[in-house]
Amino acid sequence: MSHINNYIRIFITLFVCISVHGKTKFTDRQVAMMIPKYFARDHNAPKITRTRVYGENGKKILHLNIEVNRNRYENQMEYALSAMASVSQHAARPFDTFVLIMEQNSRQVNDEKVEAKAKCTIDHFVFKRVKNDRWVKKCLNVEEI
């Protein structure tokens, strides 16, 4: 009887250890290197011109510059933010903010800077917990630069 109890304890201990450490976490550098690979999977993805991870005012920021086509502007912005959310959820330390610089391919239109709260954006794109209207109002800030 004591052997069975010992086996049960060992099994439970192993199960807890595996479940706690089951999700792989990546460094900031690894996350930054995964973004271009994510974009390479889709031939309609916008072109990436810069990827950075940095800290500012105690916040961790994932920064991405993309070239956008004004005909597919909305889709390219959402694609880039979705990619940032999908990849960054695997970071060892979570990001606070996503910064997306959209460089226009037309000189008549100004470039735009999009700042999005990372947790809210991940909840919107990955877990589908935040509806689009709420995400746009509460989590997103778009300004011309």
Task: Identify the residue ranges that each predicted region occupies.
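Sec-dependent signal peptide recognition
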Residues: N5-T13
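Hydrophobic h-region of N-terminal signal peptides that target proteins for export
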Residues: T13-G22
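Polar/charged, Gly/Pro-rich intrinsically disordered segments
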Residues: K25-V68, R93-I145
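Soluble non-cytosolic domains of exported or imported proteins
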Residues: K25-R29, Y73-E78
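Short, non-transmembrane amphipathic alpha-helical segments
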Residues: E74-P94
